[in-house]
Amino acid sequence: MGRFTEIYRELLGVIFPPRCPVCDGLLSPYEHLIHSDCQKKLIEIKQPVCLRCGKTVIAERHEYCDDCRRTVEDCRKYRKKDFYRQGKALFGYKGSIKETMYRFKYANRREYAAFFAETAVDKYAEWIRQCDIDVIVPVPMHKRKRRERGYNQAECFGWQLSQKTGIPMARGLVRRVKNTEPLKQLGYVERKKNLDGAFQVLDSIVKYDHI
């Protein structure tokens, strides 16, 4: 670890004192990223899961969740290449994790990124290695939302993931040029329309095969 990184982490600890991502309470110097009692409250993703996005599916006979199944069928029907390889999930979106994600995204709890990144590496280290990833590119926010929120939680997570894996992170390779509606409020068709033309990819991204 370089001296600059050490100084950055020390400053980050002063500005954003470590808090438990579940209860949001301050962590003692002897606690690492999360209170031990709070760790038990998180519901980890278990099989069976969607082979494409990693979300829990109802039965093992279902390879894909409903959204991914429709996407795969559309790609086959219209002979479009699906550049998306695979996604992984850490926790089921229920219980304590809902409040955690809300604070991470909207309440300036960017320090939660360290917990999510370490959990991801612990759970999927072998999968990450097999993917042979060239660069981590965080999903960009529209400049208007970025100004309002003050930070991009995807960048916080990407930076922490980069630090823990050694995979470089690159900002600016993809720009968000359309201020889209929140996807959670939209159905499958509306989501596709909402994201149409939302991003601009820079030519410099072509030097990377696995992102």
Where are these regions (language model features)?
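Glycine-rich phosphate/pyrophosphate-handling loop used in enzymes and phosphotransfer proteins
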Residues: M1-I211
